[in-house]
Amino acid sequence: MTIKRNCCNANLLYNNFIGEKMRNIVGPPVSGEDFWDREEVIELIGNSLKKQSVLLSAPRRFGKTSIMRKIYENSMDYLPIFIDVEGLERPEEFISILISEVYKRNKNLKDNFLKNIGIKILERIDKIDIWKLRISLKENLKENWFELGRELFKTLKISEKPILFLIDEIPLMIRNIKDKEIAKSFLHWLRGLRQMPEISEKTRWVFGSSIGFNYVIKNVGTTSEVINDLKTIRIAEFERSQAEDFIKKLIDEEIEIKDLDSSIIDGLLHKVGTPIPFFLQVIINELINLVKGGRFLSPDLIKDAYDQMLSPWNRSYFEHYYERLAIYYEPQMARVVKKMLSLIAKKDTVNETELLELFRREIEGKEDEDTFSLILSDLENDFYVVKRDTYYQFSTKLLKDWWNRYYG
């Protein structure tokens, strides 16, 4: 059975919804009434899934995970499976978790589940809880995860509903796999699943990525061919009108101001720069705290809120922008990338040639210009920097000021 055209319709993935009461939750993923409408992104995902699987790309705290959870909660014609794989290190872990989750969500599979593939636990499957099933699968998959894992996914063809796998942070899992040959094989194995008709006609995938995937792929010794069948959808910053609505909604819900003066909106957007949702949440949170402490809401108060946001006790708001470089890159490369960012923050704008000279000097000829180009692309993709002609600068004044204060 092929996936019905209407099964992937965006309206079935997402019920257009803005909660009656939305809290300003800074940092962790949100759901329900706290989820801010990103209908255009969810509609694009739904339309794309009619034809192919999706790579959903966004920096940390851009709402990627919240969007994936919203799809999980509102998928009507799919059997949705949501897994965060950031902490996984082996293909057999990945396979055992996904298959056991499908079994848990789809009881009609149990009579045919795992048949004729040589797994000894079958005779007792009715008595095995999901956790024990996961452990047993992992043990059985250790020696031959490539072939046996493929056979396991073939069993999903009997599912009444098409299965939607929502896999968050897949590049970080690939980064965690110590053996690069295994990592490379796993990427090709995943692509193979998406290409096999007997599997692909009953499955779709949404992979979430908070880091540049191409550098990870290059680092394990393969090419972008392993993901070129995916539709890449990037979660961008707000449009001006979206940002204005977002600001009005948050301030109204927290301190009950229905008709917010335009000078407050303009002041917030000027201070933050590029209207990234998380950055707006942080400064609004500080602004509201000042108002609740007895201060009068005015454009002048925005400067104080901005200073509070950059204060040492709030340093953790943005520390992940620094820490994630050590997770993403090898130690020497992480050090070089940090130096490049510090140079850009200090000088405001830096020519690409000057950055290349710094890169060559620090790497000492151990990497080529393709790697340099990939790094700059990743830094753009992750909203650290933006390119203007041949010059690079920080994408937001806020992040530049924070970087200069603590790492400049």
Language-model region placement:
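A short, conserved structural fragment
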Residues: E380-D389
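Accessory beta->alpha helical hairpin/"wing" motif in late/C-terminal subdomains of nucleic-acid enzymes
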Residues: R388-W402
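Walker A/P-loop-proximal flanking segment of P-loop NTPase domains
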Residues: N6-N74
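Winged-helix-like regulatory helical subdomains adjacent to P-loop NTPase cores
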Residues: K271-E367
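The catalytic "switch" region of P-loop NTPases
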Residues: F17, K161-I163, L172-K271, F278, ...
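Short amphipathic alpha-helical interaction segments
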Residues: I363-N381
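Alpha-helical DNA-recognition elements
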Residues: N74, E286, D378-N381
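P-loop NTPase nucleotide-binding core
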Residues: Q52-F62, S66-K180, T203, E369-D370
